[in-house]
Each structure stands twice: as C-alpha cells, then as structure tokens.
Amino acid sequence: MKRIAFIDLGSNSVRFVIYEISKTGSYRLIYQEKESVRLSENMWGTHELTKEAMERSLRALKGFVHMANAMEVDTIKAVATAAVRLAKNGDAFIKAVKERTGLNLECIAGEEEARLGFLGVINTIGLKDFIIFDLGGASTEVTLVKNRHIVKAVSLPIGALTLTGTYQKGDEYTPKELEKMTKAVKKTIKEHTWLQNIKLPLLGIGGTARNIAKIDQRKLSYPITKLHNYELPYHRFHEILEDVKGKSLEARKKISGLSSDRADIIIAGLTIVDELFNYVNTKTLVVGGCGLREGLFYDYYGENYLGGNSIIDDILVHSAENVLLSMTKHELVHAKYITKLATTLYDALEPLHKADKNFRRCLIAAGLLHDIGKRVNYYSHARHGCYMLVNSNLYGISHVEQAFSAFLVMNSHGLTPKEYKIFLYGKLLDQEQRLLGQKLSIILAIAEALDESHEQFIKRLEVNIKYTSVVIKVFYLEGRDVSVTKTAVEKLSKSFKKEFKKTLEIEWHESRKEA
C-alpha cells in the first residue's frame, strides 16, 4: 500500500489531495482539502506577491504537510502555477516554502500546466475532440484536443482574480469598467486565431466552471449532485451570466450554488467563458471536476503502473475495474463473466432491442458493478448498487448514461412501481430510454442467472431469433449440475416475453471443451 499526496498552489486557492494505491494497482482518493489563499491578490501593480498573500499560503502549506505526515504519506508532489510563475519574487517565495515547510515546491510552465490539466480531463471524460479551458485566478490555459491528443495549447494572461483587481476599482463594476474588461478579454482571446470558429465543445475546469455547474443544477433541481461531466447549453450559461451581472456583491453571495468566497470575482470568470463561447462559436459547455491535481496523479500513476503511458485507452472499463479491484478475486471473476454473457446476449438480440453502441457501454458498466451494493448490505443490494454506481468515479459515460446504467442494476432485480417513484435519477431518462432500460435489464438478469452458482461453467451461447420465440442454446461444461441455473433462468421467462414480445426457450447442451 502506498500513499501519494499532491498539492496544487494556484493563484486563488491551494488544493491538497491524498491517493492510496494498493498492491493490485487499484487506487482511491482518501483525503482532500482546499484553502482560499488568493496568492495573486494585489500583485498586479508591482508584479510581486504580497507579504499577506504569501503568509496565507505558507500557513496553508504547513497545515497540509502536517496532515500528510499524520496520514503517513510516502511522497508529496507540490506545484505552483501562474501567480508564482509571473511574480518577480516567485523564487524567494519558493525558498520560503522550503524553509518553513520542507516542501520542494515546483513552479511549472504554462505548457506543463495545460498538459497536466489535459491528463486530468482525458482520463476521466470520454470526449475525443474538444477545447479545454482551465480558468484560474491569474491565467487561463486553453488546449485544443483532437482524437484525445493535444494539438495546441496556450496560457492566456487573464484570470478571474487578476481581471477583477485590474478593472474593478470600487465595490462593483461600473458599466464602463465592465466594458473595458470585456474588450480586454476579447482582445486577448482573438490573438489566437486557431480558436476562431472551431465549433468544438468547451470543457471547463477550475472553480469558475464548477460554480457554473452548481448554479445550473440548483436552478433545475438536478437529481445528481455530481459536477464532473455535467453539460449545459449556451443559453442556460448566458442566463446565469446575465443574472450574476445584474446583482450586487451581497446579492451574489446569496445565489444558490455560488461559493460566497468566489462571489466577488465570478463576473470576471464568466466574462472569459462567454468570450470563449463566442470566439470558438460553440453551443455546449461540459464541466470537468478533474483537472490539474488529478493530472498530477495520472502522470505519476502512468509512469509507475502503466509502463509510462499516462493516457488510459478505455476509461470506462478502467474506472469500473478500479472499483472492482477493491472486491475479492471471486467477486471480480464473477462480475467480468456476467458482463461477457450480457454483452453476448445484447449483440445477438440487437434486432429486437435496436439500441446503439452507447447503451452497450452502459450494460458493460452495469454488468461489472451489478453486485457492488452488496458491500453495503446484501438485502436491497440492487438499490444500494444503483446509488453507488451513480456516485462512484465511473468515467467515460455521461450523467444520463450513468443513470441508465444504475437503472439497469436496480431493474434487473425487479423494480416495482413504488420503487420506481423513488428512483431519484428517473427524471434524467425519457420514456424511450426507460422502455429500452426494461429490455436491457432483462438481458442483465439472464446473464446473472446463467452464473447463479458463481461457477463460470457456461462456455458458449448461441441465440436464434424466431417469429414467436427466442431460442438460447447454452453450452456448459460436461458433468456440471445445472439445476440451480436452470431454475434461475426459467424465472425470467415471463418478464422476457413481456419486454420482447416473444417466448424464451432455453436449450441446454453439455460441452466437452474446456476452452
């Protein structure tokens, strides 16, 4: 077991995380803390970090080092970004950090900051072509991603804290100040013509992006509190922008979903996002909950556990298997076996359910994690599993797809009308998705029944779709007792006919082949 800590000292806040990596290579976040230190506050007249800002940061870092020692962390990796990078006294501050805390604080270049942010995103969100913006207090890193690789990146010298300090002279922006700031942001972005009219979705990381998602979720009474991979269209973002701009500081502090410690700088942050929307000419914003500090982790993990490859190929399977690695070997084998059977049936029955490949990935997620609820309680484990699936670090599928996967887990054990009413994530699914979910739930249930005894003795399935029936030939290892399995599958015949409008016929055949 190994514990690794990462510290991300930004211009507005400093974040501290601890990951635990097991001998099997599975990992989990075990601690996280954030302090608002505003390191870049009031530095733009002199281009020097102020004594007060440095002292706030040093106190926070000292506390994090104490926590790392208390939790027996093996290694600490600490990085600083734009504020330290641009300050005349940045080197002196790094020296003070070493003297006061013992930390070796590394000031990373804008390109490295963009790369680490990219790693945090690409290993946790399943987009291929998009534009990342990491909006911080003193800079905004913008990265063009195509086919899951960086094409171009730039560090823009505009951030929520520095723009506020430069253009807002009183408690509120005057119309003229707001106009000047907007023009400055527009001018800075337009210097990079490769962004113009590219029409790819924006993917935002950083506090401003997360607050946009929180505000929108509260307005919609969104059933999932997860911010990562949350998507909203431009018109809803623009409503938030206009609402925020029309309120005083005290009124902004009361906006549901907006952190009170960000209320004074949020207008500048939203202005940057708005101008990116306009210049890129896109209508979609995806919010990422994983950024630079997760990038630090994946950089380390790839180097030490993945043979130097820090970009994970299939993030859905990887993240699901990471959850599964906390299970016993027996549970892991069963979960993978169920998933294989379920996808075999899914492919064979495609003429009947007519679902696209995205729903196949949902079935994979549901199959791998179908028994995860048993870690809470065997009884009602489907309901527990539903909640855990939605709230686990499962990457590569959208919120709707995650809710759909959770529905499969819950419904595969029989979801009564009363239970469906309390299925919190049901409002994310439309009627067509719910009807499809009922069909795929039966497929998952049959796959579970086929390994009812957890012996993995079924070697092959052959499916024949007829006019009034579906015939499944089950080839199992010679000499095995299939009575329990037969009973479990037969119980699903009625549900199968209800959903697929055909009778289910199972033929059992002994197979002499072990492979």
Model-derived segments and their meaning:
Residues 87-94, 486, 490:
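Short, surface-exposed alpha-helical segments at coil->helix boundaries
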Residues 1-5, 9, 14, 19-80, ...:
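N-terminal glycine/serine-rich phosphate-binding loop of ATP-dependent small-molecule kinases
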Residues 4-8, 130-134, 202:
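Short glycine-aspartate micro-motif
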Residues 472-487:
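A short interface-forming secondary-structure element
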Residues 18, 42-67, 81-88, 101-123, ...:
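Helical "lid/coupling" subdomains associated with nucleotide-phosphate turnover
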Residues 452-457, 498-502:
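Short secondary-structure junctions
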Residues 138-144:
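Acidic, divalent-metal-coordinating active-site segment for phosphoryl/phosphodiester hydrolysis
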Residues 500-515:
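A short amphipathic beta-strand at an alpha->beta junction
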